[in-house]
Amino acid sequence: MLNGLQSDEVMSRKLIFTVLACLLFLLAGCSRFNAAGPAQTVKVYTTLDKTFVAALCGRFAESLPQDKKIAFVISDKEDELEQADCIISESTLLQQKAVAGSLQKIHAEFADLLPAELKDKEEQWVTLFYDPAVLLVNQAYSRKVGQQQLLHWSDVPGQKDARIVMENLSDNESTMLFLAAMSSRMGQDECMAYLRQIRPMIRQFAKFPITPVRMAATGDADIAITRRSHVFKYLQNDFPAYILIPEEGTPVNLFGIGLLQHSKRQKETIAFIDWCLRSSEARTLLMTTRSGYLPVLPKGENGQAVNRDVLWTNTFYKSRQALEQLAADWLREIRLADAGEDAK
C-alpha cells in the first residue's frame, strides 16, 4: 500500500509539473504577443478623395502580418497637414513642400526603378500613379468618321465638323497643369497655335469636370477633352463613348507621396511606398475603386516604369506666377476669342 501511495504522489507531482509547464508556455506566448504592442499609427494628409486613399492604405494594412500591423489615420483638412507623417497629393504640392524643406529623403527600394522625371531630384517625394488627359469620343461619331481617323492630338483639328467640349483651362490646378504640360512639350507658341486651331470647334468651356463627360456620352458633343479620372467612374459596358489616350503621349497629372521632416514613421511609410509600387494588389485597387489613375510601374517589381516619353509633364512653368501668366495668356488669346461658343 505504501508503494501505491508513493506511486500516486509521484503521478500527482508529474501532473502538477505538466500543468505548470503548460501555463508557463501559454504565458510566454502571451508575452510575445503583447510585445508586438498596438498597431503603429501613420497619419496621412491627402488632397485626393479620402475614400480612395483609405482603400489603398487599408488594403496595405491587411497584407501585413499580425505582429507588424499599421493603423492609418487619414485627413484632408489642411490645418492638420503639419501633424501628418506623410502627404499623398499631386506633385505640385509635394514639390512645394520639398523646396520649403518640409520633407525628408525617401529610401524606398522600388523608387529606384522610377526615372528622374517621376520623383524629386533629392528623392524627397516619389510618384505612385498618374492621371492622363484623354479624348472621350462619342461612339456614334466614331462610327461615322472611322476610329482610325482619331488616334493622335494632331488628328483633332482635322475633324472640322466635330463638336468639342472641355473644361475652362484657367479654372483650377488640374486644368492649368494640362495647359502647362502641353506647352512644355509642344512649346508655348505651338501649343497656343494648336488650341487656336480647334477653338472654332469648341462648343463649351465647362465649369465642372462632369460636364464634358456628360455631353460626350449623350451626344451633345462628339469629343470631350478631359481626364481619365473624370470618366472612369462612369464607364460601363454600354457606355456610349470611349477613352482614347493619344499614341504619342498626353499631359498627365502626377500623384505621389512625401514623408514629412518631423515624422518618426519612416519604416512604415517606406513599406507602404514599396507596396504601392510593386504590388499587383495596389494596381488592382486602382481599377476596382474606379479611380482612373494608372500605375507608374505597370508590372510592379517584374517590369520597367511607364515610358516617360508619353507622359507630358510641366517642366517649364515652375513658379506660381509663370503658371498663372500662361493661363492668362490662354484666356486672352484663345478663350475670349469669338468662336460661337455656347453661353453657359
Task: Report residues per predicted region.
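Mature extracytoplasmic/periplasmic domains
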Residues: L260-K318
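A beta-strand-loop signature enriched in Asp, Gly, Thr, and Trp
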Residues: S229-G258
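Early extracytoplasmic/lumenal segment of secretory-pathway proteins
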Residues: C30-V99
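Extracytoplasmic ligand-binding site segments that recognize negatively charged/polar headgroups
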Residues: A39, T47-L48, D79-A84, E90-V213, ...
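A ligand-binding cleft/hinge motif common to bilobed small-molecule-binding domains
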Residues: T92-V99, A217-P240
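Extracellular/periplasmic bilobal clamshell ligand-binding domains
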Residues: G300-K344
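Short, low-complexity disordered leader/linker segments with a strong preference
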Residues: M1-T41
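A bilobed periplasmic-binding-protein/Venus flytrap-type ligand-binding module shared by bacterial periplasmic
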Residues: L136-Y141, N253-R265, L285-L286
